[in-house]
């Protein structure tokens, strides 16, 4: 089981991630003149409001210096803003602006349409197996 898991993580998972997400992320970012990492951040922020820089670094798996530059760029473009927290005035949370929210929603809607087309090519049994596999992987990630 361990050997298959390592093979899955090193070979199969990157293919799945690329096929279902990264290829479309790249296409969308090129068309809309936004960097892939910026778009990933907007989509992540859409689903995780009120997150601080430290948490965002961890979730996006990037260094704090890189994240600071990323947030600076998104802020200049009008996609995010920094807000001081009530608990600690030295700490900021990153919040989507209306424009950033619109981009995230547009990307998610277009990605959803793209994924629906792919999933329609699977038979019902394979779609159900796919959903079960996702649930098992989510459980495993929480252990």
Each model region followed by its residue ranges:
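Residues within helix-turn-helix
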Residues: 53-54, 65, 72, 92
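Short amphipathic alpha-helical/adjacent loop interface patches that line ligand
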Residues: 13, 38, 60, 64, ...
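Hydrophobic recognition helices of helix-based DNA-binding modules
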Residues: 16, 20-24, 78, 107, ...
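Charged, amphipathic alpha-helical coiled-coil/dimerization segments
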Residues: 73-128
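C-terminal regulatory/oligomerization modules of transcriptional regulators
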Residues: 1-4, 23, 125-143
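N-terminal leader segment of winged-helix/HTH proteins
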Residues: 1-32
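N-terminal helix-turn-helix DNA-binding core of bacterial DNA-binding proteins
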Residues: 22-63
